[in-house]
Amino acid sequence: MRLDNPIGIYLLLWPTLWALFLASEGFPDLKLLLIFVLGVVLMRSAGCVINDYADRYIDKLVERTKHRPITSGEIHHRSALKFFVLLIMLAFLLVLLTNWLTIQLAMIAVLLAILYPFTKRWTYFPQFVLGLAFAMSVLMAFSATLNEIPITAWYVFAATVIWTVIYDTMYAMADREEDLKIGIKSSAILFAKFDRLIIGILQIIFLLILIKISNVFNLTISYHITLLLVTLLMIYHQYLIKNNENYSYLHGFLHNNYIGMVIFIGIVLSVGL
């Protein structure tokens, strides 16, 4: 579940909170807020379990992952699969407290979560699939709040997908050399020596979508100020990954948490006060 390393929970939680506060104009229903926060913890934990299950043979070949519980034999893979099902069932019970549209979206989200760890075997875009899986929480937040998915929600969806590709590519850059040896695919391998350039282009697109979100949701100057901070953070991330060191790549990945947090603060200041 990796609750001792909650960065994955944070990175999934921020877009979910963006969507909840935008959909509710700053005042989300407390019940929905609790449902989605707990749902994020459960689904991210389930995602970690199914990822480690799918990669249990691959992880043995990678220094950073060879001591994970399933790979090392500390936890039997069948027990892990049963635990994954339990987590999914608990998350589904939470979704049952919403509406039918959100339940349907949750089913798609589960399928994407299961698909993601296997995509690295046959496509260079597992990061994009992860982005789709994470962004489903955005659509679910809008549907649970409004019982529909307005066109404006798709801007938040797109921003989440692109942001996920950005930070997960940084994460994949740390494993690139070992992934090449064992035949695992990723956007980091596809981008190769152009990785910083392409990440930079994606960062610009991400920022442009965030500006569009400001327009369609009529956000105030508080949000615009936070976008300046987001821009500075992305410049800093470019500085980090230029060092071509695994530590720097992972630092850049972890530091993206602040981007999610800053955007959330900007949204709250714009619509909730």
Swiss-Prot record:
Example GO CC term: the record gives: plasma membrane
Instruction: Tell me the membrane topology, using the record's own terms.
Output: Multi-pass membrane protein
What are the recorded GO MF terms, alphabetically? 4-hydroxybenzoate polyprenyltransferase activity
Q: Record keywords: Membrane included?
A: yes
UniProt keyword annotations, A-Z: Cell inner membrane, Cell membrane, Magnesium, Membrane, Transferase, Transmembrane, Transmembrane helix, Ubiquinone biosynthesis
Q: Entry's CDD domains? A: PT_UbiA_COQ2
Under which pathway is this protein filed? Cofactor biosynthesis; ubiquinone biosynthesis
Q: Which InterPro entries does this entry report, sorted A to Z?
A: HB_polyprenyltransferase-like (IPR006370), Prenyltransferase (IPR039653), UbiA_prenyltransferase (IPR000537), UbiA_prenylTrfase_CS (IPR030470), UbiA_sf (IPR044878)
Q: Where found in the cell?
A: Cell inner membrane
| Listed transmembrane segments | 7-27, 30-50, 83-103, 122-142, 146-166, 197-217, 221-241, 253-273
Cofactor needs: Mg(2+)
- What is its biological role? Catalyzes the prenylation of para-hydroxybenzoate (PHB) with an all-trans polyprenyl group. Mediates the second step in the final reaction sequence of ubiquinone-8 (UQ-8) biosynthesis, which is the condensation of the polyisoprenoid side chain with PHB, generating the first membrane-bound Q intermediate 3-octaprenyl-4-hydroxybenzoate.
HAMAP family, A to Z? UbiA (MF_01635)
Q: What is this protein called?
A: 4-hydroxybenzoate octaprenyltransferase
